[in-house]
Amino acid sequence: MAVRLSLPAPAKLNLFLHILGRRADGYHELQTLFQFLDHGDELHFETREDGQVRLHTEIAGVPHDGNLIVRAARVLQEASGSTQGVDIWLDKRLPMGGGIGGGSSDAATTLLALNHLWNLGWDEDRIAALGLRLGADVPVFTRGRAAFAEGVGEKLTPVDIPEPWYLVVVPQVLVSTAEIFSDPLLTRDSPAIKVRTVLEGDSRNDCQPVVERRYPEVRNALILLNKFVSARLTGTGGCVFGSFPNKAEADKVSALLPDHLQRFVAKGSNVSMLHRKLETLV
């Protein structure tokens, strides 16, 4: 008998991003601080007995078998030896190439949903290790806690930080992470810092100058948002954000922005809404 489950795939913000150097394998050593948003995609799962993995929602420009959702399901199927399959539907709300984790979050939600639906009983560490094979940001979503990240982003230290409201502006661009990290003008020698330093305000996003230069839409969004609040790029962008002490103030600034700018207001959270939902499942 088919079993159904619906779960959120929350957005995240990089509250800062420092690049410490480039490794011999081409990846970059970095430090960043992840916090979740109570806003994201929604995925719907229904088990099937024939072992097939089917995503019924098409994403423009992304082939079915290349979608991280499908890849996550299949890599878990292979690693666990499960003979079960799944039908998946996606309510897509997060932009692609936005720097707020849409694809990685969808993959993490898929891993955790199927761990539950297929009765695998995998622990957090095992799921996170598998998630890392899909992308450096996937483990933070599978673990579901705000975290100070190091290495290529996979070394996570949970943190308890303020949970403000955020106004996130979504420029209509698709930023290529690979292009940003290969840009010759990217800062790659930032000194390592402590979480305390970040919370005191002494931090930045090393990718921001490169993204602003390559994508005028992002630069213009930052200029507009900076009129009202200290604004910053998240990840490699193109989304930019500012923080507020309450929803009313975030909504007030949102209403002042030009109509053509896509944006949303969401609460920051140190425990992802995915994990809050999982805790309610028996």
Curated annotation (Swiss-Prot):
<feature type="binding site">
    <location>
        <begin position="95"/>
        <end position="105"/>
    </location>
    <ligand>
        <name>ATP</name>
    </ligand>
</feature>
<comment type="similarity">
    <text>Belongs to the GHMP kinase family. IspE subfamily.</text>
</comment>
<dbReference type="InterPro" id="IPR014721">
    <property type="entry name" value="Ribsml_uS5_D2-typ_fold_subgr"/>
</dbReference>
<dbReference type="GO" id="GO:0019288">
    <property type="term" value="P:isopentenyl diphosphate biosynthetic process, methylerythritol 4-phosphate pathway"/>
</dbReference>
<dbReference type="GO" id="GO:0050515">
    <property type="term" value="F:4-(cytidine 5'-diphospho)-2-C-methyl-D-erythritol kinase activity"/>
</dbReference>
<protein>
    <recommendedName>
        <fullName>4-diphosphocytidyl-2-C-methyl-D-erythritol kinase</fullName>
        <ecNumber>2.7.1.148</ecNumber>
    </recommendedName>
</protein>
<feature type="active site">
    <location>
        <position position="12"/>
    </location>
</feature>
<keyword id="KW-0418">Kinase</keyword>
<dbReference type="Pfam" id="PF08544">
    <property type="entry name" value="GHMP_kinases_C"/>
</dbReference>
<keyword id="KW-0547">Nucleotide-binding</keyword>
<keyword id="KW-0414">Isoprene biosynthesis</keyword>
<dbReference type="InterPro" id="IPR020568">
    <property type="entry name" value="Ribosomal_Su5_D2-typ_SF"/>
</dbReference>
<dbReference type="GO" id="GO:0016114">
    <property type="term" value="P:terpenoid biosynthetic process"/>
</dbReference>
<dbReference type="Pfam" id="PF00288">
    <property type="entry name" value="GHMP_kinases_N"/>
</dbReference>
<dbReference type="InterPro" id="IPR006204">
    <property type="entry name" value="GHMP_kinase_N_dom"/>
</dbReference>
<keyword id="KW-0067">ATP-binding</keyword>
<comment type="pathway">
    <text>Isoprenoid biosynthesis; isopentenyl diphosphate biosynthesis via DXP pathway; isopentenyl diphosphate from 1-deoxy-D-xylulose 5-phosphate: step 3/6.</text>
</comment>
<feature type="active site">
    <location>
        <position position="137"/>
    </location>
</feature>
<dbReference type="InterPro" id="IPR013750">
    <property type="entry name" value="GHMP_kinase_C_dom"/>
</dbReference>
<dbReference type="InterPro" id="IPR036554">
    <property type="entry name" value="GHMP_kinase_C_sf"/>
</dbReference>
<dbReference type="InterPro" id="IPR004424">
    <property type="entry name" value="IspE"/>
</dbReference>
<keyword id="KW-0808">Transferase</keyword>
<comment type="function">
    <text>Catalyzes the phosphorylation of the position 2 hydroxy group of 4-diphosphocytidyl-2C-methyl-D-erythritol.</text>
</comment>
<dbReference type="GO" id="GO:0005524">
    <property type="term" value="F:ATP binding"/>
</dbReference>
